[in-house]
């Protein structure tokens, strides 16, 4: 299996990207091509077995306007990576770089699955039982129509079943209440569509319950999803910051901290994004994974593993076939 990776994307690139790639080729049956500045990549590449470098000095930064950058910076590492997938030189691609640029490259270079109107950015987030849940969309498109939410639900359900190995994954619609008929025009119409869709729809779910594992897939528009995602991230960071401040406030609390250090470490691991890989851009013609901007080697490794599983378990072909079959039923 061939994977293309933007070696220059992310806060800790290229070092952590290279380290994650080396870990992956040691443990997974993959061949990796790193796109980026060879002079910066090579010092970290101590084992180049099954890893090749395509040199380019052009990079899309976080300050670049996404669409313009993808169209003008033809030799940027992120664009060359996406082109490799388009030209069938790679089966999937991964970047921890500019999210908007990756979405633009996904749309304009890799292309959409026929019948999918808009791709969805879809991370797996932690739950208290450690199983996690998939949420989509978290920002690929701030606006959505009921049909888009239906497509998100189908794609999320297929991914959860094939990659996360959840039989009959529970799909919930993010809303302001759990009762039928709650919400705005979008959620009311989407609710009706989801009820008749070939998925295990469990109804409306509230944001306060999603970390408790109320659903395996949570569907929402990109605006609400992004707000929910940032709230979860911010709340987790704040809790750990407050906890650290309290435990370090006196000799007594420092002694207590020493006693529960291992347990707190386990709690932090449970909430660690790096264990879940990256956010898939579902709806594209091939797997495209957005790794977190602050990804370390472990997060990159898990994003590579995630991309490998998406290819192995034929997530994209299954989405394509399902959307096509639904389209035929609607035509009849």
UniProtKB/Swiss-Prot annotation:
The enzyme's E.C. designation: 2.3.1.274
Record's keyword terms, sorted: Cytoplasm, Lipid biosynthesis, Lipid metabolism, Phospholipid biosynthesis, Phospholipid metabolism, Transferase
Biochemical pathway: Lipid metabolism; phospholipid metabolism
Gene Ontology CC entries for this record: cytoplasm
Catalytic activity, as annotated: a fatty acyl-[ACP] + phosphate = an acyl phosphate + holo-[ACP]
Pfam families xref list: FA_synthesis
Gene3D superfamilies (alphabetical): Isopropylmalate Dehydrogenase
GO biological process: fatty acid biosynthetic process; phospholipid biosynthetic process
Gene Ontology molecular function: phosphate:acyl-[acyl carrier protein] acyltransferase activity
Location of this chain's protein in the cell: Cytoplasm
Broad class of enzyme this protein falls into: transferase
Family named by the database record: Belongs to the PlsX family.
Function: Catalyzes the reversible formation of acyl-phosphate (acyl-PO(4)) from acyl-[acyl-carrier-protein] (acyl-ACP). This enzyme utilizes acyl-ACP as fatty acyl donor, but not acyl-CoA.
HAMAP family: PlsX (MF_00019)
Subunit annotation: Homodimer. Probably interacts with PlsY.
Full protein name: Phosphate acyltransferase
Organism: Oceanobacillus iheyensis (strain DSM 14371 / CIP 107618 / JCM 11309 / KCTC 3954 / HTE831)
């Amino acid at each position: 299996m061939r994977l293309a990776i933007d070696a220059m994307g992310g806060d800790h690139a290229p070092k952590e990207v290279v380290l994650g790639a080396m870990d992956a080729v040691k443990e997974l049956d993959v061949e990796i091509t790193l796109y980026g500045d060879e002079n910066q990549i090579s010092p970290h590449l101590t084992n180049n077995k099954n890893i090749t470098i395509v040199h380019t000095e052009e990079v899309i930064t976080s300050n670049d306007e996404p669409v313009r950058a993808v169209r003008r910076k033809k030799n940027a590492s992120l664009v060359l990576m996406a082109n490799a997938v388009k030209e069938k030189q790679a089966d999937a691609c991964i970047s921890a770089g500019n999210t908007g640029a990756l979405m633009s490259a996904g749309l304009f270079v890799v292309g959409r699955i026929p019948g999918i109107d808009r791709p969805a950015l879809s991370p797996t987030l932690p739950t208290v039982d450690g199983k996690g849940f998939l949420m989509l969309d978290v920002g690929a498109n701030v606006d959505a129509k009921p049909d888009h939410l239906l497509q998100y639900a189908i794609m999320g359900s297929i991914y959860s079943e094939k990659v996360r190995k959840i039989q009959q994954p529970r799909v919930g619609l993010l809303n302001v209440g759990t009762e039928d008929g709650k919400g705005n025009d979008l959620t009311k119409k989407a609710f009706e569509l989801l009820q008749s869709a070939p998925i295990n729809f469990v109804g409306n779910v509230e944001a306060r319950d999603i970390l408790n594992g109320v659903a395996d897939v949570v569907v929402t528009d990109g605006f609400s999803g992004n707000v929910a995602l940032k709230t979860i991230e911010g709340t987790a960071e704040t809790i750990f910051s407050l906890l650290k401040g309290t435990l370090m406030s006196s000799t007594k609390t420092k002694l207590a901290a020493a006693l529960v250090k291992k347990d707190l470490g386990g709690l932090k691991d449970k909430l660690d994004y790096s264990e879940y890989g990256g956010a898939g851009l579902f709806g594209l013609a091939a797997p495209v994974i957005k790794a977190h901007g602050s990804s370390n080697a472990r997060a990159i490794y898990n994003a590579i593993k995630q991309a490998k599983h998406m290819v192995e378990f034929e997530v994209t072909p299954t989405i394509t076939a399902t959307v096509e079959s639904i389209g035929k039923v609607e035509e009849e």
